[in-house]
Amino acid sequence: MKTIIIRKIPPIDDFKRFVPKRFSRFPQLYLELLENKNKVKLNCIGKEFVPTTPPLSTGRETIVSKDPHVVQSSISNTPIRTEIKDTPRYEETPIKRTITVTNVKTVKSSSISGMNGRNRLYDDDLFDDDRYKSPTTRKFQGEKRDEDIRLIPKSSNIGSSKYKPVLTRVEENENKKIHIDQRKESIVNDERKKNPEFREKPDKNEDKKVKPPPSLKEIENKGIDHEENEEDKKRELMFKLQLLQKQYPLRDIPDFTIRSEYKSMKKTYDIIVKQLSVDSSVETYKNYLVGGFMVCEMVFGRIGFDMEGFTQQQLLSMNSYEKLLLELGEKTYTPAGMDKWPVEVRLALAILFNAVWFIAAKMIMKKTKINILSLFNNTKGLNKSGTTPNSVSPRTWGNSKSPQSEFNFIGRKNENNSVGRTQMKGPSINRIDEGFGSESDESRREMREQGIETLK
């Protein structure tokens, strides 16, 4: 006979059965109340619940008693029934409970102090079952404590002055706080009535209150207001740029539209205003320089130095001071609205300075016979036209009546030599053609024929 050997092979990983995990049962189930936490008993948090009654059992355990017909239940707070074998009926006999009534004066102070807020946190009126009442330890089971004594007056007249309800520490503290708050409010109201200054002061608690978040309509309205304000600002900047274009037509000022970005418009406007203010400050400092040149010429001339023509020479070389004057103008630049002096005062000072400058130039012209004002104006015109003060157009070199004849230029060249540009060659003119147009047409023809014969 053939023998068959059966070997058990473990299944492949892909075909393994899924076995659910089984966890061991917990001895107790803890629940946490998430709603209505005002009713949560604080002293039960983090503590093991010890019931005052033994746990329920599935089967009823009988307690041996002297009376064989009485069957006592193991569960407390249940009625005791008598069981008769012959009859299925039974009678319920409730447990008699006694209530000790004592007077307030006879109660010791230690018993009242023992009634702290911990036991008062339990609301015994919520549930009738004893299981939900305040827990007691096993040590005091079956014993009466002073804390369990309830003070019940003999008479039903609770509002009488002889019997007053006993309050716990928590209730007493709450009453004290309420009394203190009421006292503070009365004092504050009295001060407000007496002092009008105190009445105007806002309440600090109002500032601390958290404002509710804005609604969607409020957010949309704010966005619309922001867009309208931005458009108004753009129009104002466009108007200012148009004014600058009229005042300074030679300046290249860009054009913007209402669709342009406000930030770029603002930056461009600030840069243009800064450039113009720096240029005006440079021109002002040039006047100061000319005044300084004249003072140096007069002072050093009195000492004994030959300083004649110093101011005229410095006016011609004014470009050497341009860099320093630009740095000084940028250093002293202040944005619009940031000046210490108002516009009216600055305008009056400018008029006063120009008057003093004009008087000084006239006095110098009488003594030295040099027109400083015309020299200074000519240097300004040359600088604005883009040419240097040392170069003048060749048309004015030979003209003594031109206003630039006061300048004495060294190294002057002839007009023919100075011109280096290539010129187009025109038709050659003979002496015969010099009188062309002065005689009649017949004489012109004769002269032309003679000229042609001579050329042949």
From Swiss-Prot:
Broad class of where this protein is predominantly found: membrane
Gene Ontology, cellular component aspect: membrane
Keyword Oxidoreductase: no
Bias type Polar residues, positions: 383-407
Residue span of region Disordered: 181-231, 383-456
Annotated localization: Membrane
Protein name: Uncharacterized protein 067R
